[in-house]
Amino acid sequence: MGDPKKSRKKWESPGHPWIKERIGYEQELLGKYGLRNKREIWIAQSIIRKFRHQARSLLALPPAERAVREKQLVGKLLKMGLLKRETATVDDILSLTEQDLLERRLQTIVYKKGLANTTYQARQLIIHGHIAVNGKRVTSPGYIVNVDEENLIDYYVTSSFKSRPPVMAQQEGGEAGVKQA
């Protein structure tokens, strides 16, 4: 029996920490997708960077091998939901952004399906075990949902939200977050 595998970082932080435009853009993404910290953005950027690197390396291959590997990569990205059409090319892969990947996170899809009122509530429901994918509890908001699984997202069987979904908070007298009885 060997030693356990060394865990490595899944992300790479920006080279220069204080670029105003990048900081503003990242703050916008944090709010839009309900992310906990900028590391989640950097993880998405690293994943997209890896796919783009694979696509660029395809361009150097001989045409026969390139066609096979391109079909495999496009198939994987179609299954993940990052590409929309089967006739996608290397150019489509090179034009992917981190927003495309953030749209495929479980947290975002739970919010867009209407199972939660906000992206932050979606994150809380997932972490507390109220959300299931294909009947199995998933507690990771960063779970990348495949296209096949997208329609199988629902409340977990024993969740209290199954019978009574979250009610949209009503504003009364300017107070946010007060629920009406």
Swiss-Prot record:
SUPFAM superfamilies: Alpha-L RNA-binding motif. This is Small ribosomal subunit protein uS4. GO terms for molecular function: rRNA binding; structural constituent of ribosome. The keyword rRNA-binding applies. One of the primary rRNA binding proteins, it binds directly to 16S rRNA where it nucleates assembly of the body of the 30S subunit. With S5 and S12 plays an important role in translational accuracy. GO terms for cellular component: small ribosomal subunit. Keywords: Ribonucleoprotein, Ribosomal protein, RNA-binding, rRNA-binding. HAMAP family: Ribosomal_uS4_A. The keyword Cell membrane does not apply. GO terms for biological process: ribosomal small subunit biogenesis; translation. Part of the 30S ribosomal subunit. Contacts protein S5. The interaction surface between S4 and S5 is involved in control of translational fidelity. CDD domains: S4 (cd00165). PANTHER family: 30S 40S RIBOSOMAL PROTEIN, 40S RIBOSOMAL PROTEIN S9. Residues 104-166 form the S4 RNA-binding domain. PROSITE patterns: RIBOSOMAL_S4, S4. Belongs to the universal ribosomal protein uS4 family.
